[in-house]
């Protein structure tokens, strides 16, 4: 802005001088005395600037610098002379100054001339180059700039250091790439002039990854899991995708990074598929929807987190009909959908797991016959995934107990068994836990029967004296007993358990005038803590059900910090028995 001001001032003064009458030079405002129109000049590049002089005789103009030149003054009449000042092109980065002396018979004056250096940002070197290791690593960019800079980088680079100096080195770490080859630009831009920038493009090929870990090993690495709930399982309607229709935002990479920063290292992605079919006769899923799910999986596994993709409720085409007996039409859908899902996601290594269903039989009575139907569809899931080969030939697969109910999953009379799999040690069992349900799920007082109000306070140490909102069942010992059932039935036999969902509903104090808000929040945090700890202590991997109430879906930051703190306390305290 300073340079533009000098130029504007020069033009204004020059116009003022040259518009004077030859017969009345006092109108110029410089009188009969010696006068030079400029005492300071800023030269932009090599563009000349005009100087006007009022003198009794032709002035002499002398520059003290070789790069600074003056033309011979021209006489414009009435004692007015003009000359141009120009400079050689300045290819350096520094600012240089010179002095021009103007002398006539009736006076002398000096003009201070400034020429700014060349503005630039230059990439001096990159280490180890611009082609990155597929398995992850660290890169450095050495650059020089003539001023402070703004820096933009692709989301998959994490800054180690970042400085805005005349010369500096940027360092970034990057994780292994388990998806397609990816490229990203690092752009360094001068803050003072955004048109001046330098760009370096990095490329990272995908790694083949590792598929050697069994289910127990992978489960032991899952510190704390979370669901992207009410998002990818929202059905499409009239060609409009459902993602974001039930929540405040679509999934983005900053949200995923936020989950990792909180301490989660495993993410369950409930998915709808049936409403995304573009050819019903052949059960063909929209390839663009498969790509979108793959994109989210890629964000997760490239953060070195684990991902679970399932077929969720999905309109109930399978889960609501297991009580009707086996259906070849449903079985074909199960086969065709999983063949496409597994094929599209085959490139991901053992960080990705598949879950064949969600809560089979939840909306109908569970009998041994119903269980047999569930088992047939789960066998189809295994066969379809394994048939796609590649990484899927040995990928860990998750099988849902009847209704994902703990008691029904361990009930010997129902005769639930895992499907046959030629690959040993790659199976996990899934259950969900919303106990006590009148604390976690009940939406309205007495909706499930008389004298059944919503409960607000779980854990005896957080009960409120005299309140009918204290939980009267499902306390700590009950939670331990339930997870112990899964430990005895499966974990002790080498089969880890996934707690695919658990959470308690967020209650609005405005709906409960009598609520002790502090005690309620302490209680909810404690429920999160205890469920998480007890699950891990019994060999069950916890995946918290979250739909945007506890965590901001845009930036991945906590909305209910107390709830997240409870989860992390439980994750830290819990120790897997394997």
Residue ranges and their predicted role:
Residues 83, 93-106, 180-192:
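A short beta-strand micro-motif common to beta-rich folds, especially ectodomain repeats
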Residues 33-35, 54-82, 123, 144-171:
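Surface-exposed binding patches on compact interaction domains or structured appendages
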Residues 211-213, 217-396, 400-411, 539, ...:
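Active-site mouth of glycoside hydrolases
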Residues 1-18:
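Sec-dependent bacterial lipoprotein signal peptides
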């Amino acid at each position: 802005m300073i340079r533009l001001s000098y130029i504007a001032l020069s033009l204004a003064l020059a116009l003022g001088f040259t518009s004077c009458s030859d017969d009345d030079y006092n109108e110029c405002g410089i009188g009969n005395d010696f006068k030079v129109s400029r005492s300071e000049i800023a030269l932009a590049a090599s563009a000349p600037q005009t100087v006007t002089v009022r003198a009794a005789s032709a002035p002499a103009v002398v520059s003290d610098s070789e790069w600074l030149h003056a033309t011979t003054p021209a006489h414009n009449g009435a004692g007015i002379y003009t000359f141009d000042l120009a400079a050689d092109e300045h290819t350096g980065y520094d600012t240089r100054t010179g002095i021009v002396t103007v002398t006539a018979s009736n006076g002398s004056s000096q003009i201070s001339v400034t020429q700014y250096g060349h503005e630039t940002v230059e990439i001096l070197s990159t280490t180890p180059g611009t082609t990155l290791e597929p398995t992850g690593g660290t890169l450095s960019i050495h650059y020089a700039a003539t001023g402070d800079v703004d820096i933009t980088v692709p989301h998959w680079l994490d800054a180690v250091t970042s400085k805005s100096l005349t010369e500096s080195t940027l360092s970034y770490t990057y994780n292994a790439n388990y998806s397609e080859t990816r490229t990203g630009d690092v752009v360094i831009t001068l803050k003072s002039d955004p048109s001046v920038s330098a760009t370096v493009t990095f490329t990272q090929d995908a790694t083949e990854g590792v598929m050697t870990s069994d289910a127990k090993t992978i489960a032991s690495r899952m510190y704390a899991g979370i669901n992207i709930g009410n998002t990818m399982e929202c059905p499409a309607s009239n060609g409009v995708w459902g993602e974001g229709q039930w929540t405040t935002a679509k999934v983005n990479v900053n949200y995923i990074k936020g989950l990792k920063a909180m301490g989660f290292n495993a993410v369950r992605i409930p998915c709808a598929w049936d409403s995304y079919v573009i050819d019903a006769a052949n059960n063909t899923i929209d390839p663009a929807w498969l790509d979108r799910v793959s994109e989210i999986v890629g964000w997760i596994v490239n953060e070195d987190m684990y991902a679970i993709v399932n077929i969720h409720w999905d309109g109930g085409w399978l889960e609501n009909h297991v009580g009707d007996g086996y259906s070849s039409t449903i079985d074909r859908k199960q086969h065709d959908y999983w063949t496409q899902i597994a094929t599209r996601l085959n490139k991901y290594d053992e960080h990705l797991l598949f879950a064949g269903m969600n809560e089979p039989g939840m909306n109908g009575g569970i009998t041994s016959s119903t269980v047999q139907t569930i088992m047939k569809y789960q066998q189809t899931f295994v066969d379809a995934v394994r048939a796609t080969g590649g990484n899927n030939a040995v990928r860990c697969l998750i099988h849902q107990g009847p209704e994902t109910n703990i008691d029904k999953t361990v009930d010997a009379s129902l005769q639930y068994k895992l499907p046959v799999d030629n690959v040993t040690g790659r199976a996990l069992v899934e259950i969900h836990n919303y106990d006590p349900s009148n604390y976690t799920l009940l939406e309205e007082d007495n909706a499930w029967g008389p004298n059944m109000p919503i409960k607000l306070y779980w854990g005896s140490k957080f009960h409120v004296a005299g309140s009918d909102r204290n939980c009267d069942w499902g306390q700590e010992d009950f939670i331990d007993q339930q997870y112990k059932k899964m430990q005895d039935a499966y974990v002790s036999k080498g089969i880890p358990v996934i707690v695919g969902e658990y959470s308690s509903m967020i209650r609005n104090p405005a709906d409960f005038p009598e609520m002790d808000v502090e005690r309620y929040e302490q209680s909810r945090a404690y429920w999160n803590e205890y469920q998480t700890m007890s699950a891990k202590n019994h060999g069950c991997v916890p995946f918290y059900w979250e739909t945007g109430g506890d965590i901001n879906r845009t930036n991945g930051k906590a909305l209910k910090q107390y709830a997240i703190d409870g989860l992390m306390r439980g994750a830290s305290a819990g120790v897997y028995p394997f």
